[in-house]
Amino acid sequence: MSQDLSAALFKAYTPLLDEAYKLASLTSKLDTASELIRYTQGSREVVVPKMTLQGLANYDRASGYVGGEASLTLETLTMNYERGRMFSIDSMDNEETAGVAYGRLAGEFLRSYVVPEIDAVRFATYAALAGTHPTDATINATGWYALVSAAQVAMTEAEVPESDRHLFITATGHADILNKGLTESKVFFDNFASVTVVPQARFYEAVTLAASGAGGYSRTTGANNINFLIVHKPAVIQVLKHQDAKIINPQQNQDADAWKFGYRVYGLNDVYDNKTKGVYLHTSQVTS
């Protein structure tokens, strides 16, 4: 098999990474619709629409309407998340088998390392930009129901639309609300567009990304644990792109008799500055 053909086999797996991401990620449901964004500068920047309106004014029968402004501007934002990793797979007699090995490696890497980090970064980003952020040292048993209910009321009072609100909550909080009974908890959860249980390991107020070594992320020292996060989807800008895999065949590899595969992902996670009330954060204090 030619090197060109085998490289094509490896690259054929790249589009599948997008599908694997969507299935494994807890936050992919918040991805901004592709028709609402436009890429510039080699996909390093995105252009998103931003609408500004004015309220009603008096109408005078003699002079008519009071002038007002309605503007739709395009805001350019730079990608704020970019990560990568280079892998090596020993050269094999059957290069097609090497392609399958890469597919399995990439899939497992995405599920076990990439997706948890992407979710954690997004939660931390939205936490930092949340319009409302109460904190409790502890939450009493059966207290979660009241706290999430209060969050819903606060968002409604802030005139955040009740549709398209997504609840992200810890397993402890989810279980506590379920203890209210099947009927009551179902009615409660049905108020949300979706309810997602998030492992605490992805649910921090702030995270630190490792620059080298084993890579990955960790809770930033002093950052609180997130109890729950309610996101009105139109309030956030969430974009993710997978770079086509960089393939170096064994003949070109000067370090070893192995295939090298470069994986790279970049994206944008942000909250519209005029829609911060569309993100409600509740955290618990931690001691370290």
Across the structure, where does each feature detected by a protein language model lie?
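N-terminal "assembly arms/tails" that initiate or stabilize quaternary assembly
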Residues: 1-76, 282-288
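Structured, hydrophobic secondary-structure cores that serve as assembly/anchoring elements
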Residues: 47, 53, 66-67, 73-101, ...
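Extended oligomerization regions of viral-like shell subunits
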Residues: 42, 46-47, 155-243
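Extended, compositionally biased alpha-helical segments that mediate assembly or anchoring
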Residues: 245-288
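Short, Φ-rich (hydrophobic/aromatic) sequence segments
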Residues: 13-22, 147-151, 228-246
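Alpha-helical scaffold segments that mediate packing/assembly in large oligomeric complexes
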Residues: 93-160, 280-288
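Short helix/loop capping segments that flank catalytic or ligand/cofactor-binding pockets
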Residues: 56-59, 176-179, 271-272
